[in-house]
Each structure stands twice: as structure tokens, then as C-alpha cells.
């Protein structure tokens, strides 16, 4: 821990210099609002209803997920005969409207299991695109959401990235037109995006439409996690701040967005409330990069943070803070788990604030401990004058 504390002190000095350099080197105008995003995604879960969320910790809450119909291009919720989905959406928004102050909610469309090919067609076809956009605005307004979040995982070609840029342009125009005709406050428009501004690990090299993002989105939720997955044959930091051997890290990814031209205040850093586990090939070889034979406990090795805490306690696991990656992991026997804890989250939040980013978000509600240990650590974001 002592070495990690030194790392934190070093980071503070370095990040201030980097933040100043980034600010002076970019001409992209920053949003006028000084509000910082402190968000969390909620997944439909009867064991963790929206009312269980500690709203004192968050400024925005996302409903995950809804999807368009592959034949009509309208959100399923607009055509749903059953009242089940409508009740879920209404309960969600009403839960946060009654808070003091009310907490803005966003309807998130897509997700990791959504139909990427369908999104590609919608983005490229003017008729399908208009139908989809109008449906999202209609559903958001009907159920009382304050904004729309788009999670396309992921555009696979340069053309699809260009089409995404046009989709965002038309979406913003439709939101502005709706506001002009109804005198309602404009819906927020955000997008969940890859950890880096460009895709360089596989497939066609392509870059997000930065100009369209700056002009049409309120912010992007950068998924700075899942950097190492169950398919890897060695252990790794799933959301490590650094990687001396590659550009696959939180720091590299966020700086790619800034260097790419996105205004820092439009970049919101994502953090996971879960870890990734592996089964070690040799329990005596247990550092970062140790060979493994496959996923450990959990679905595909995924473990909610509260499950990691329980595992560490029950198994007497050794907890290690790794200064090379700026991450934490634990191991016991053949089980190895990489994750974020309150300390690493406080470091990341300090990093985001030093860079003058737009804020942070967590995936996902219900994964933290019952007393919100990790989420509470995000209070490392200091009040701004």
C-alpha cells in the first residue's frame, strides 16, 4: 500500500501538468455548464429496484436497456402490448422525480447484446433513421425521461462511424425541433463509447466522429473497463490505469479521446462495480500476467464487487495493489480476481478531475456493497468553486 500511496502522490503532480497541457493545446470550446456528471446505470432487477439506489451519490441515472424493433425501427416499448415494460419505465422515472432535488434520468438504448447490424442499417438509411429517432423521443417523453443514451457496441467500419455522425446530427436536430414546438427543456443526448477514440486492436481501424460528438452530444460515457476479459490466457487488470506494454489502459484511452479533439468536459469516465476472475494455471504464479486456464467464479468470470469482498473474506484471499497498472487484485488457491476497490476508484476520480473531465459513471447499480463502499469513494471528486 505504501508504494501505491506514493504512486497516488506522483499522479497528482503529473496529472495537473497533463491537464494544463491538454487544456492549452485544444481549441475545441467547452460546454458552458459547470455541472459534473456522477452517473450510474441500472439494469432491470427485481432484487434491486430503483428505490434501492442511494441518490445522494449520483446526479444522473440510466435505465439499461431498450431496443428497436428490427422490422419497424421503433423502440419495442412504443409497440409493447403488455403493461410490464411500461410499468417498469414509469416506476423508474417516478422514483427519481420524487427525490429532493429530482434526479435526471436517461433512457439507454442498445447495450452489449444489442443488434449492431440493425444499428448500422438505421444509421445509414434516412427513413429508418427518422423513424428510430422520432420513436426514441416519443418514448422518452411518454415515460418522463430527461434524456436519451445510445450504446452501439460497436460500429465496425469507417462508413459506420460516418453514419453514426450523421445519426447524431439528425438526432440533435429532432430534439431541437421538438423543444421548439413544445417549449419543453431539450432532452439530453449522450452515447456510451469504446475506451479509446479509435479501434486499433482488431478489425478495420476506425475512429469515432469527433466533430459530430462535439456538436451534437451532451457527453460521451467512455467505457474504461473490460480491458481484459475471460478470453485472455493470462491474468490482467480489467480496468487498469496503466499498461507499460500497450495502449490498453484507462489513461491511454482517455487521452486518446482528448487528443482526438473531444472537449474534456464532454468526456465522462466509466468505472466497473465488478471484477474479472480467472483460474490460475499454477497457484504459485499469481501476479499480473500469470498464465490461466480459463474463467474463475461467476458468469464468464464476472463477479460483482460485493461478491469479490465476500470471496476475499471467506477465502482469506491475498489482496495486492499493483503500482505498475494502478489496479488491485486478489488471489486464493487457483482463483485470481482483478477489480476496482474504494482506493483505486478514489485515485481514478482524482485523475478525472485533474483532467477537467465531465465526470464519471459506474456500471452498474446493485453490484456494489450494501453500504456503497466503492460508489462512496467517488466523493474524492472535490467540490468546485
Swiss-Prot record:
Residues carrying a glycan: 115, 134, 233, 247
Induction comment from the UniProt entry of this chain: Induced in roots by Nod factors and infection of the microsymbiont Sinorhizobium meliloti.
Active site location: 153
SUPFAM superfamilies recorded: (Trans)glycosidases, Chitinase insertion domain
Cellular component annotations (GO), alphabetically ordered: extracellular region
Function per UniProt: Symbiotic enzyme that hydrolytically inactivates Nod factors (NFs) with a C16:2 acyl chain produced by the microsymbiont Sinorhizobium meliloti. NFs are lipo-chitooligosaccharide signaling molecules produced by nitrogen-fixing rhizobia to initiate nodulation (symbiosis) on the roots of legumes. Controls NF hydrolysis at the stage of root hair infection. Involved in the regulation of growth and branching of mature nodules. Modulates NF levels and signaling to complete transition of infected nodules to functional nitrogen-fixing organs.
Outcome, altering residue 295 to S: Abolishes Nod factor hydrolase activity
Protein name: Nod factor hydrolase protein 1
Signal peptide start-end: 1-21
CDD domains: GH18_plant_chitinase_class_V
Record-stated family: Belongs to the glycosyl hydrolase 18 family. Chitinase class V subfamily.
UniProt-recorded Gene Ontology molecular function terms: chitin binding; chitinase activity; hydrolase activity
Example of a GO biological process term: chitin catabolic process
Gene3D superfamilies: 3.10.50.10, Glycosidases (3.20.20.80)
Gene: NFH1
Keywords per UniProt: Glycoprotein, Glycosidase, Hydrolase, Nodulation, Signal
PROSITE patterns tied to this protein: GH18_1 (PS01095), GH18_2 (PS51910)
Domain (GH18): residue spans on this chain: 36-385
Keyword Glycoprotein: yes
A Pfam family of this chain: Glyco_hydro_18
InterPro entries the UniProt entry points to: Chitinase_II/V-like_cat, Chitinase_insertion_sf, Glyco_hydro18_cat, Glyco_hydro_18_chit_AS, Glycoside_hydrolase_SF, Glycosyl_Hydrlase_18
SMART domains, per database record: Glyco_18 (SM00636)
